Structure formats: C-alpha cells, structure tokens
Amino acid sequence: MQYIIAGDIEHHIFISDWKTAFPTAKIIGPDGLPEKRQAATDDKIGKEEFAVVYKADTKRSTSVSPEFDADIEVEYVDGHANKEIVLLYKPDKVLIQADLFFNLPATEAYSRVSEADKPKPGLLARTFMSAQKVEGNGQKRLLWHAISRGNRPSFNESVQRIDSWDFNIIVPCHGDVIESNAKGIFARVFEWHLKGRK
C-alpha cells in the first residue's frame, strides 16, 4: 500500500489506523484537513503528516508521484462543501468518489443481511435517502441549492472536467456501485452543473 487518500474533509477518521498498518504510505487529502486533524481532541485521530494536500489554486498542477499520476486522474472539487477528491482509475475506467453524490439506498451493504435484521429507517432517514437517489430531481436540487452554493462556478468546472473523463463504473462512498450507464447517470445527476444553469 503506497497511498492513503482521504476522499474529502469528512472521510478521514481511520487515517491513523491505516498509517500504522502501512507506515511508508503517503497520506493525501484536501485543503483544511491537516489542520482539522491537528485540532481534533479524539485520541483515534492522529497528527500524521500529509504528503500531498490538494488546494484550489494548485489543483491542476499538484502531482502525487509519476506512477500515481500515470494511472490516476484527480479532480479536487473545492467548490463542494466537503472539498471532494475525485479519482479516475484510468486502466479500468473506474470513477471513485466520497460525497460528490450518493446512490442510496445502499442495498449492496446489506445484501447478506436477512430482511428481518435489516435496519428500518425512520421518517427523517427515509426523507434524507429520498434526496440521495440518482433517480428524480431530489439530489439535483440538493447539489444545486446547498452543496455547491459556496462556489458554484468552481463546482461546475470540476463536474464538467469529471464528465469529460472516460469511465464506465462509479464507486461512491455512500450507496451501491454503478456498473451500468455510469456516464449517463453522472450526466443526469449533474445536468444543471454541466449546463451551468437550472
């Protein structure tokens, strides 16, 4: 294992555990995360050094290593509220992302659990999940009105760049892997951002 990547400013809790298991691995993360971890009071969150930190003003020129850069395309979505690092594993055409968008419900995660033992979401969880599906306009609205609100021009530019990549599969942190019509689903979810308007 050569790299430990925090997919955004929220997905970092187990970096210390991974660094202990793989002490020579380089830690990669978004702007603000090293400082957030330094200020943390949780004993499980260490003070490890980051080898590469993606920043808005240098995101196109940031290099991890020649080997990494040859196989992986990176887009730092600084316009996203969580400061997303989106990866394209070029050899297999796989897009990997944390919170750029969700694909709920997460049926794969519970595929080995009996119906009787599956969690039963309450009203709030059902409402949240309904806005985190790739079908319909709920997630589109959330992305447009809330998630990208802080810097929509930069968010749009990032989404447009990701859309130009050649991928067939999307691996989200939240929800099922998208193995069919990945480009079409991406274009539908981000339609307004790709056009730059609603």
Where on the chain are the PLM-derived regions?
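Catalytic core of the metallo-beta-lactamase
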Residues: D43-R126, E157-S158, S164
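Cap/insert and terminal regions of metallo-dependent hydrolase folds
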Residues: S16-D17, A21, P105-T107, S111-K198
